[in-house]
Amino acid sequence: MKRFLPVLLALFMLVGCSNGADKKAEGDKQKVRLVLDWTPNTNHTGIYVAKEKGFLDEAGIDLEILQPPEGGAEGLVANGGGELGISFQDTIAASWAKENPLPVTAVAALVQHNTSGLLSLKDKGIDSMGKLPGHTYATWNMPIEQAMIKTMVEDDGGDYSKVNLIPSNVTDIVAALKSNVDAVWVYYGWDGIKTKVEGLETNYIPFIDSHPEFDYYSPILIANNDFLKNDPDTAKKVLAAISKGYKYAAEHPEEAAEILLKASPELDKKLVDESQAYLSKQYIADAKQFGVIDKDRWNAFYGWLWKNKLIDREIPTDFGFSNDYLPQ
């Protein structure tokens, strides 16, 4: 699924948006707006389950789910155009590595481990990162992305200079792999499953197998800092309901898939069913509960970015996330 580029101008956009959490919705429920990162998909299923099963209603929350602007959810949430949003630990890093960091905080991990990796057709023979040289790779042209690929290729004995980089924001993985693109960075739970559903034979290399630092959090639920400061009770209520939704989706993948399809009937049923079967096992995985962020893993990735000069300023230890709003 598509990821947006970092929000480079977000700090200059902090005008003109009211805080919707200050308004009571119909029936005296508290209105909260959540900005997605992309069109609805199985990363979001727990949110739709929380709505459909009444968990949000029980918490007194009227949740409005919004599509993101072209720049992604981060800037809109920082501006006060949404109380919550979906982002990624890697792409938001540059916005936090500033004198005035983007005023948002990660309050939950939607998927417990990084499920991204390199995907290619099996007949290309790219069954390890060291075999990527001599092939084409679709790049977002993001420094962090390219540095990670370079590190993994070279650590596996490959010559990164021989990787043919093709700037491309792939939106159709099947079409891309059937064109002049040999390898793509994907999230297996959607694009990897899509190639499986389409009957393609592929090689998939999970990035977390290469470096423990690459087991960062992706995607994450972020919240506006003023919202957290001024209305922590509402933040905790909505997080409790969403957590309940993801726990239910983890335990009932087939029903969860039907709920997502009901909310977004334009989605391909077979893809959603297969993707949900995979991701339902990833929402919580080996964590003690849904959403919890391990500080060591969080800090390890940002430490790697700073060590490799991929951010302008060091991100302080334990900065940018909080587990305090999750159910205790």
Q: What kind of feature is each model-predicted range?
A:
Residues 13-16:
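C-terminal motif of bacterial Sec signal peptides marking the signal peptidase cleavage site
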Residues 18-20:
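Bacterial signal peptide processing site
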Residues 2-10:
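Sec-dependent signal peptide recognition
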Residues 298-328:
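Conserved C-terminal helix/tail region of periplasmic/extracytoplasmic solute-binding proteins
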Residues 89, 172-263:
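Pocket-lining segment of extracytoplasmic ligand-binding domains
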Residues 27-159, 164-167, 178, 182-186, ...:
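Short, glycine-/small- and polar/acidic-enriched structural segments
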Residues 44-47, 74, 78, 89-92, ...:
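Extracytoplasmic/secreted envelope proteins and their assembly/folding machinery
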Residues 229-308:
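Secondary-structure end/capping motifs
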